[in-house]
Each structure stands twice: as structure tokens, then as C-alpha cells.
Amino acid sequence: MVYGKKRNFILKTTKTIIEMKKILITGGTGLLGKELVKGFLDKKCTVYFTSTSKQNSDKFLKSIKLKYKKYCVPIIQNFNNYDDINQFITKYKKVKFDTLINNARDISNLNLKVTNYEHYNSFNNEIFLAVYLPYFLSINLNHKFLNHIVNITSMYGVVPPNKNLYTDKYKSSPIYYGVSKAAEIHLSKELAVRLADKKIRVNSISFGGIEGRVNKKFKKLYAKMCPLGRMLKPKEVFEPVWFLCSNQSSGATGHNLIIDGGWTTW
């Protein structure tokens, strides 16, 4: 299900109509995804974003400024297997995306599973969303127009969790989360090399903990263990992503930008 219109603007000097940049964000209705959608809208882009829930998508759209709504293109889409990816690519391959932001994930995988079978499935699901999905989207979207790819990863793709932060024996940060994010960081480097001749820059961002889904006790403990003494705020998420999609980072590809308040420095 898709809503939206093509967005254009007119250069006053030449009166030439130029199509605005189109951005594709997977996972656009989560804590981080919503900040990215709003940020790109503020930069006057047309934003396509995926969500697995029409209810969440509709709720999010109600919170967006009225003047931006027509520049939003919500796509209700599950990514559970290769067929889902292939159907999505077939449908949107001709869209002239300038930027791809790979941010999709399944929050339910955060909970450590009880049985080996459940654990096995969660491991596969996490790897699928962090590696397979970004890879197949990156190599199959229209490279004639694609200029930037940014993979959203985590500080736990750089360092393992600190056991002193968790009172539930890592249940809130299962091993497959960090492993999949580490793989996504390396995928970014591989794609940066392989897509360089097409003038497509590929980078990743490892964010630290972001306020919004944790209790006060966790925030206080996290603050004691982080050099900046706090978690990231949702409003701090967009600008680093924008930096990697702008001419200010024109010489950067294959880089993993760490925004974690200094967590990984010790």
C-alpha cells in the first residue's frame, strides 16, 4: 500500500523543474526510523519508508507536519524471506532513489529465546534483516540514480555488551544482535569497494544507546558507564546520517561512523 506524490521544486534562476531527492528508509516507524523520516522531510526530500504495521504507519503519519504529508510514501511491507525482498525490488526498482537507509529490524528478537529452536530462528531473523536485506536492496535498486547507502548498526557491532549494564544475564542484548551488527558493518565495507566504480558511497553508523525504550534505572546505570554520562537523545540521530548522505562527506566510503557518547573508547 503506497501513498504520496512526486515532489518537485523550481530553481528561480533557471525556472527548470528538478525532481527532489527520493529517500528509501526500511524500518521507518521505530524509535530511530521516525527521526530519520522527519529529518529527511525537513531537508525537503521525498521519503519512502517501510513498516510492517499499517496501524503504526498511520499513527506516525498523524504526527507529521501537514505540509510534509504529501511527501511521505509509507509502504506496508514484511521482509521475512527472499521472496518478500524480490517482490519489493520488482515493484520499486524503477523508482529513482538517491539514498538507501537500511534500518529495518525486528524488536521481538531482542528477547533471548528459551529453546534452541527459538534461538536458532531469532539468529537467522536477525542476520536476515541486518545482512541479507541490506545486501539485496543495495545491489538491486537502480544504480543509475543511487548515490548513497547508509546502514544503521550499533556500538555492539564494534564491542560486546558490558555485563555490568545488564541485570538479566544479557537477555536484553542477545548474542545474535551484536554478531549481526558486526556483519553489517563489514557488509558496508564490502559494498563500498564493489560499488565504488558506480559512484555509490556506502557507509554505516554505529549508534550507542538511545533514550526511549529503557527505564530510569537502566539510564542511570548506563550514564555511569558512558564517558558523556548519558544515553543519546532521539533528536541526535538524524544529523550524522545526513552528514553521510551529503557532499560534506563526499570523500567517505566504507567508513563506520561511531556515535555512542564515547562508549567504545574504553
Locate predicted features.
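Conserved glycine-rich cofactor-binding loop
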Residues: 29-30
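Conserved glycine-rich Rossmann-like NAD(P)H-binding loop of the short-chain dehydrogenase/reductase
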Residues: 43-59
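Short C-terminal tail/terminal secondary-structure segment
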Residues: 253-266
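Short, small/polar-rich loop/turn modules that mediate ligand/substrate recognition or access, typified
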Residues: 196, 201, 252-254
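Catalytic loop of short-chain dehydrogenase/reductase
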Residues: 150-197
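Conserved mid-core segment of classical short-chain dehydrogenase/reductases
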Residues: 105-122, 160-169, 214-217
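Catalytic Tyr-X3-Lys loop
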Residues: 106, 113-135, 150, 173, ...
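A conserved structural motif in NAD(P)-dependent oxidoreductases
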Residues: 226-237, 248
